[in-house]
């Protein structure tokens, strides 16, 4: 009867499960965190240390979270967890953007627009926003995001609104807020103004018309037409001037008995447009642009005369060299019109309907285009009509085209602070680096910021008007309103009459009858979120955050508005570092949509596969660019996760019965091969910690995962089996290996906690001699200052040598010479340099274990070589090394001694 020697082996033993079952287990781990109050406990641990503030940009409180939200919040969680484990005090205040059109539109969608008076609409909007905040809060928590979830900041909170109004007041006091009639981006669909940040540019079909305006007869200008080109025929009834460039050359040409005035450099382009033969073009006269100033022409559409003016914004190339000017429908037109005191005529109203300035009154502007083109043709003023596809601004919410319309609006003066904005932009660290150029260009080209909106759900613009309709720009008055809002909420702006809103006994010389009115427009929601740094003041934290991290679309949005309000009031940027991530697409780089059936829902993935799988996917992407996800990509991430988990399990299993207080052997007392393993790992740790420090999470895995799979699992733990399983429990080298495994595992758990916190928390629960109640309460590994270079150099030479030996063994296995490496006896020919490496590491007697063979014979030669032979003798029935010379002997001498 054969003896079962397996029972004499010290096999790995652990209750840590092989299968993660993350969908269910993560919820239990999160309950463990909640019971510990883990977020607050970590803050208390670091409360006396330097702060590190990541300011959470507020997502919009509308709908469930999507994979873009998951990417954003998980990246932030990586940073906060890492910095807190470094020892920084890292409060994370989650926030939500709770005002604005999408919420108002969603509420109105459920009933007719006229069914609500203002107060019930405000109540319904608030109810809708809070419901979505609560929903998203639980969804973010399911992803393992830590933060002060009990005390988030909401842009609808009384304290937030009052602080926002105070910031507005400071900007008023500095002369940065003004009301003016200006052309703005206007949505006729929403009947509201839009900021630059609310525009998207899409390809759009527009009419393309070339129109001839008859010049008033004067000497040479008899029967001459000024030729203009426009893609907005509906603006022609609002035309009051035609602009030419003062320094450019113009020619009066005759083509087939018709006379036109056009730019000289535009003639080749016009030849193609009108199919003119060059020989049919006769140049009658040549002029410098400035000589044409004040000449007049007739606009037959409205039977009015306009004049030629000079402007620098007239360009060569495409077009005619003359620009149709309608100050009511374009900022450049408006600005040049101011110089000439031109009338601001608007041919359409807020609904996009034509006004009474023309016979087209009542037509929607797109319908008016057709009628205008028809009338121009009848009048013989139309030279050519076509349709072009070009980039055109659309409202980013409705996806409908916007128009330019002159209306009285409230603005922030960018011009006054532009130089300081640019100066502060240069002080910020931008990741990626091109972010600085992008923001610089945006600020350089930015016009005054239109902050008024003609909607209901938002923060009122806290301005009163005198009897003469003059706005009262008074800091004390605005701060008084802010105090009222903080006490009673912003709805009082609509519920209370003006006198109740004003300070008691308030008087103003411009209102002798003590009559006042109030502004009914609300603030742009970007002004709301753009003042969110104010939440730190009431929590006794610095206003300038260490990091803002959002999607790359926020250069025009939150990064921009926050910079403007902070520079305007604090004279500094609100952030030291700005990090951006790309958008999430499917595996083929396509946008996710329900219609395409390619949507990957983070909550579904968390339920089915686990939040740590999503987090590991995030860490494995170059998030600065657009990223991709699909089931195949997630499968690869699961495979990666499984290898990490299995390694953790094997390491835990081999720490069974390990008593750190009595079994642990310090680094200095371990033999060189185990020291070298730790030194090699510490080099990896340096790179891992540097990657974290530079927000390169892909780099964390790039350094860590190959080490786990190739160095720890495939090398160290593999060769260690012959010692861990076979030797006695108190064998010195076995304790060295266990001590090394202990150090490796603890450090791995520490550095992987920001990325897969549920898993590391679970492993830590099985970890012997855990000193904290959760791995998150540990610190990041502290790198030791050791003189490592010589030992590590020889160790790397050995690893290269071992890699070559394994290739020879694999060839022998494939040829059928051996079935497993333990059947091999290798003769190793080494150079002096290679032999020296073995001497330094003191591993010559251990090579059979390191190569997992039964016997190694060494020879000093000029060149490296390996000869593989089948080991002679019999295999030990316990350790399976082929070292027994006598038949029918079950155990080798080593195993016999162990079992004595």
Curated annotation (Swiss-Prot):
<feature type="binding site">
    <location>
        <position position="895"/>
    </location>
    <ligand>
        <name>Zn(2+)</name>
    </ligand>
</feature>
<feature type="short sequence motif" description="'KMSKS' region">
    <location>
        <begin position="591"/>
        <end position="595"/>
    </location>
</feature>
<keyword id="KW-0963">Cytoplasm</keyword>
<dbReference type="InterPro" id="IPR002301">
    <property type="entry name" value="Ile-tRNA-ligase"/>
</dbReference>
<feature type="binding site">
    <location>
        <position position="879"/>
    </location>
    <ligand>
        <name>Zn(2+)</name>
    </ligand>
</feature>
<comment type="subunit">
    <text>Monomer.</text>
</comment>
<dbReference type="InterPro" id="IPR013155">
    <property type="entry name" value="M/V/L/I-tRNA-synth_anticd-bd"/>
</dbReference>
<feature type="binding site">
    <location>
        <position position="550"/>
    </location>
    <ligand>
        <name>L-isoleucyl-5'-AMP</name>
    </ligand>
</feature>
<dbReference type="GO" id="GO:0004822">
    <property type="term" value="F:isoleucine-tRNA ligase activity"/>
</dbReference>
<dbReference type="InterPro" id="IPR009080">
    <property type="entry name" value="tRNAsynth_Ia_anticodon-bd"/>
</dbReference>
<dbReference type="InterPro" id="IPR050081">
    <property type="entry name" value="Ile-tRNA_ligase"/>
</dbReference>
<feature type="binding site">
    <location>
        <position position="892"/>
    </location>
    <ligand>
        <name>Zn(2+)</name>
    </ligand>
</feature>
<feature type="binding site">
    <location>
        <position position="876"/>
    </location>
    <ligand>
        <name>Zn(2+)</name>
    </ligand>
</feature>
<dbReference type="InterPro" id="IPR001412">
    <property type="entry name" value="aa-tRNA-synth_I_CS"/>
</dbReference>
<dbReference type="GO" id="GO:0006428">
    <property type="term" value="P:isoleucyl-tRNA aminoacylation"/>
</dbReference>
<dbReference type="GO" id="GO:0008270">
    <property type="term" value="F:zinc ion binding"/>
</dbReference>
<keyword id="KW-0030">Aminoacyl-tRNA synthetase</keyword>
<dbReference type="InterPro" id="IPR009008">
    <property type="entry name" value="Val/Leu/Ile-tRNA-synth_edit"/>
</dbReference>
<dbReference type="GO" id="GO:0005524">
    <property type="term" value="F:ATP binding"/>
</dbReference>
<dbReference type="InterPro" id="IPR033708">
    <property type="entry name" value="Anticodon_Ile_BEm"/>
</dbReference>
<protein>
    <recommendedName>
        <fullName>Isoleucine--tRNA ligase</fullName>
        <ecNumber>6.1.1.5</ecNumber>
    </recommendedName>
</protein>
<keyword id="KW-0862">Zinc</keyword>
<keyword id="KW-0547">Nucleotide-binding</keyword>
<dbReference type="GO" id="GO:0002161">
    <property type="term" value="F:aminoacyl-tRNA deacylase activity"/>
</dbReference>
<dbReference type="InterPro" id="IPR014729">
    <property type="entry name" value="Rossmann-like_a/b/a_fold"/>
</dbReference>
<feature type="short sequence motif" description="'HIGH' region">
    <location>
        <begin position="59"/>
        <end position="69"/>
    </location>
</feature>
<comment type="similarity">
    <text>Belongs to the class-I aminoacyl-tRNA synthetase family. IleS type 1 subfamily.</text>
</comment>
<keyword id="KW-0479">Metal-binding</keyword>
<dbReference type="InterPro" id="IPR023585">
    <property type="entry name" value="Ile-tRNA-ligase_type1"/>
</dbReference>
<keyword id="KW-0436">Ligase</keyword>
<keyword id="KW-0648">Protein biosynthesis</keyword>
<dbReference type="GO" id="GO:0000049">
    <property type="term" value="F:tRNA binding"/>
</dbReference>
<dbReference type="Pfam" id="PF00133">
    <property type="entry name" value="tRNA-synt_1"/>
</dbReference>
<dbReference type="GO" id="GO:0005829">
    <property type="term" value="C:cytosol"/>
</dbReference>
<dbReference type="Pfam" id="PF08264">
    <property type="entry name" value="Anticodon_1"/>
</dbReference>
<keyword id="KW-0067">ATP-binding</keyword>
<comment type="function">
    <text>Catalyzes the attachment of isoleucine to tRNA(Ile). As IleRS can inadvertently accommodate and process structurally similar amino acids such as valine, to avoid such errors it has two additional distinct tRNA(Ile)-dependent editing activities. One activity is designated as 'pretransfer' editing and involves the hydrolysis of activated Val-AMP. The other activity is designated 'posttransfer' editing and involves deacylation of mischarged Val-tRNA(Ile).</text>
</comment>
<feature type="binding site">
    <location>
        <position position="594"/>
    </location>
    <ligand>
        <name>ATP</name>
    </ligand>
</feature>
<dbReference type="InterPro" id="IPR002300">
    <property type="entry name" value="aa-tRNA-synth_Ia"/>
</dbReference>
């Amino acid at each position: 009867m054969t003896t079962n020697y397996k029972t004499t082996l010290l096999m790995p033993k652990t209750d840590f499960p092989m299968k993660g079952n993350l969908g269910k287990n993560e919820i239990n781990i999160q309950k463990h965190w909640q019971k510990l109050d883990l977020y607050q406990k970590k803050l208390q641990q670091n409360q006396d240390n330097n702060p590190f503030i990541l300011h959470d940009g507020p997502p919009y409180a509308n709908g469930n979270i999507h994979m873009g939200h998951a990417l954003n919040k998980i990246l932030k969680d990586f940073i906060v967890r890492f910095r807190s484990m470094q020892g920084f005090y890292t409060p994370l205040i989650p926030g939500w953007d709770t005002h604005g059109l999408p919420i108002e539109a969603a509420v109105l969608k459920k009933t007719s627009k006229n069914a609500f008076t203002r107060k019930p609409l405000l109540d319904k909007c608030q109810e809708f926003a809070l419901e979505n905040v609560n929903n998203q809060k639980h969804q973010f928590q399911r992803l393992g995001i830590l933060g002060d979830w009990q005390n988030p900041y909401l842009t609808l909170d009384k304290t937030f609104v009052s602080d926002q109004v105070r910031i507005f007041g400071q900007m008023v006091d500095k002369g940065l807020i003004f009301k003016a009639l200006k052309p703005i981006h206007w949505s006729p669909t929403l009947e509201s103004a839009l900021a630059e940040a609310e525009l998207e540019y899409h390809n759009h079909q527009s009419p393309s018309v070339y129109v001839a305006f008859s010049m008033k007869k004067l000497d040479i200008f008899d029967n001459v037409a000024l030729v203009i080109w426009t893609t907005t025929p509906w603006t022609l009834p609002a035309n009051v001037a035609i602009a030419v460039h003062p320094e450019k050359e113009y020619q009066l040409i005759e083509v087939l008995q018709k006379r036109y005035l056009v730019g000289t450099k535009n003639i080749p382009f016009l030849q193609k447009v009108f199919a003119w033969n060059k020989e049919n073009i006769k140049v009658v006269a040549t002029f410098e642009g400035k000589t044409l100033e004040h000449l007049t022409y007739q606009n037959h559409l409205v039977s009015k005369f306009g004049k030629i003016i000079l402007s620098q914004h007239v360009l060569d190339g495409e077009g005619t060299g003359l620009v149709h000017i309608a100050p009511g429908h374009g900022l450049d037109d408006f600005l040049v019109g101011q110089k000439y005191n031109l009338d601001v005529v608007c041919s359409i109203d807020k609904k996009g309907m034509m006004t009474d300035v023309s016979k087209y009154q009542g037509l929607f502007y797109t319908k008016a285009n057709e009628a205008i083109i028809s009338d121009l043709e009848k009048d013989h003023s139309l030279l050519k009509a076509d349709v072009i596809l070009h980039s055109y601004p659309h409202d980013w919410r409705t996806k409908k085209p916007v128009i330019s319309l002159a209306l009285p609006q409230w603005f922030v003066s960018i011009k006054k602070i532009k130089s300081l904005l640019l100066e502060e932009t240069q002080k910020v660290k931008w990741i990626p680096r091109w972010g600085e150029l992008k923001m610089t260009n945006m600020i350089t080209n930015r016009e005054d910021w239109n902050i008024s909106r003609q909607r209901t759900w938002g923060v009122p613009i806290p301005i009163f008007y005198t009897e003469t309709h003059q706005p009262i720009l008074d800091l004390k008055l605005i701060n008084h309103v802010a105090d009222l809002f903080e006490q009673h909420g912003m709805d009082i702006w609509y519920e209370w009459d003006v006198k109740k809103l004003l300070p008691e006994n308030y008087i103003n010389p411009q209102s002798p009858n003590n009559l006042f009115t109030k502004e009914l427009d609300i603030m742009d929601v970007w002004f709301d979120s753009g003042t969110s740094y104010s939440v730190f003041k009431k929590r006794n934290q610095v206003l300038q955050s260490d990091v803002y991290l959002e999607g790359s679309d926020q250069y025009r949005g939150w990064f921009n508005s926050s910079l403007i309000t902070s520079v305007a009031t604090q004279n500094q940027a609100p952030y030291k570092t700005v990090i951006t991530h790309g958008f999430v697409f499917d595996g083929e780089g396509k946008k996710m949509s329900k219609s395409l059936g390619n949507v990957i829902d983070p909550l579904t993935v968390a339920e089915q596969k686990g939040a740590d799988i999503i987090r590991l996917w995030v860490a494995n992407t170059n998030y600065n660019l657009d990223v991709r996800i699909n089931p195949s990509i997630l499968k690869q991430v699961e495979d990666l996760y499984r290898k990490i988990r299995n390694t953790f399990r094997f390491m835990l299993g081999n720490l069974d019965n390990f008593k750190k207080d009595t079994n642990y052997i310090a680094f200095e007392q371990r033999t060189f091969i185990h020291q070298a393993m730790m030194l090699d790992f510490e080099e990896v740790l340096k790179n891992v910690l540097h990657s974290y420090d530079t927000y390169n999470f892909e780099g964390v895995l790039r350094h860590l995962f190959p080490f786990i799979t190739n160095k720890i699992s495939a090398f160290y733990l593999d060769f260690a089996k012959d010692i861990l399983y076979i030797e006695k429990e108190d064998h010195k080298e076995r304790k060295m290996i266990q001590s090394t495994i202990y150090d490796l595992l603890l450090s791995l758990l520490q550095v992987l906690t920001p990325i897969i916190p549920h898993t590391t928390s679970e492993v830590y629960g099985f970890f012997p001699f855990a000193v904290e109640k959760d791995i998150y309460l540990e610190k990041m590994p502290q790198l030791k200052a050791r003189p490592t270079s010589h030992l590590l150099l020889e160790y790397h030479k050995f690893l290269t040598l071992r890699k070559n030996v394994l290739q020879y063994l694999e060839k022998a296995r494939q040829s059928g010479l051996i079935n497993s490496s333990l059947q091999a006896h290798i003769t190793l020919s080494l150079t002096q340099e290679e032999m020296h490496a073995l001497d330094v590491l003191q591993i010559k007697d251990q090579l059979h274990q390191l190569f997992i063979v039964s016997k190694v014979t060494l020879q000093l030669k000029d060149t490296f070589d390996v000869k593989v032979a089948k080991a002679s003798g019999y295999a030990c029935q316990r350790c399976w090394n082929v070292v027994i010379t006598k038949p029918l002997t079950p155990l080798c001498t080593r195993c016999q001694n162990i079992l004595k």
